Amino acid sequence: MIVIGRSIVHPYITNEYEPFAAEKQQILSIMAGNQEVYSFRTADELSFDLNLRVNIITSALELFQSGFQFRTFQQSFCNPQFWERTSLGGFQLLPNIAPSIAIQDIFKNGKLYGTECATAMIIIFYKALLSLYEEKTFNRLFANLLLYTWDYDRDLKLITKTSGDIVPGDLVYFKNPQVNPATIEWQGENAIYLGNFFFYGHGVGVKTKEEIIYSLNERRIPYAFISAYLTDFITRIDSRMMSQYAPPNTPQTSIGFIPIRDDAIVATVGHTTTIY
């Protein structure tokens, strides 16, 4: 269900020739048909969310095609022209290097980088926002950037839920409860949902849910009897918060609205929104 202000609406893409129109329409249809409530103050916020999700998907595919390597933190490596590898295996932005340039280098020279899956997901989020922000804004928000698992910049606002419906552009988690301790890095897999039943996970590539589970199951202890599974954890960029940094001239997606109800009372507790 999608709510704009106090109006429950069924939105649709009005310009079928705009970039990624089919993908955006699919996202809108999924959100409108879900039981979860997606609340936006304005149509522009919904437009930003759509464009953000599309950029998360394209950034995930770009990272997959970049040659970016899967490595544990003990074996991680980065381009020393832009980053310094920390003692824990993270990547610390070098002084006087613009975060925007350093993030773009990961996608241009992926073979010069290697790390595990959580860091890769955060890199995708940064790249998606960079596609929507002016570089000076991105560099101001994410100065002194550190890439290390979930130790992301405080200005990157994320929402993690343990319930809800998966929408393309969401980050999900596959858990492998009986992982072989010899390959503990496969205790789980963070993955971006690309839509059409496919996910991107750093280390497993672009696969269906069943294929990712199969890959994780191959790395269990001998005689394991508990399968890996897709958890109910969903992580998203807080598009309402992050949309405030988009420039005024940000291209807007052409969205039409079929009104369903315009007197909804919207109540939000934490990250859960309810309609009365």
From Swiss-Prot:
Name the enzyme group at the top EC level. transferase
Q: Read off the Pfam families from this record.
A: TGL
Chemical reaction(s) catalysed:
L-glutaminyl-[protein] + L-lysyl-[protein] = [protein]-L-lysyl-N(6)-5-L-glutamyl-[protein] + NH4(+)
Q: Which GO terms describe its molecular function?
A: protein-glutamine gamma-glutamyltransferase activity
Which GO terms fall under biological process for this protein? Answer: sporulation resulting in formation of a cellular spore
Which EC number(s) does the record attach to this protein? 2.3.2.13
What keywords appear on the UniProt entry?
Acyltransferase, Sporulation, Transferase
InterPro entries assigned: Gln_gamma-glutamylTfrase_bac
Annotated family:
Belongs to the bacillus TGase family.
Biological role stated in the UniProt entry: Probably plays a role in the assembly of the spore coat proteins by catalyzing epsilon-(gamma-glutamyl)lysine cross-links.
**Which NCBIfam families does the protein's record reference?**
PRK03187.1 (NF002869)
Name-wise, this protein is Protein-glutamine gamma-glutamyltransferase
Q: What species is this protein from?
A: Bacillus mycoides (strain KBAB4) (Bacillus weihenstephanensis)
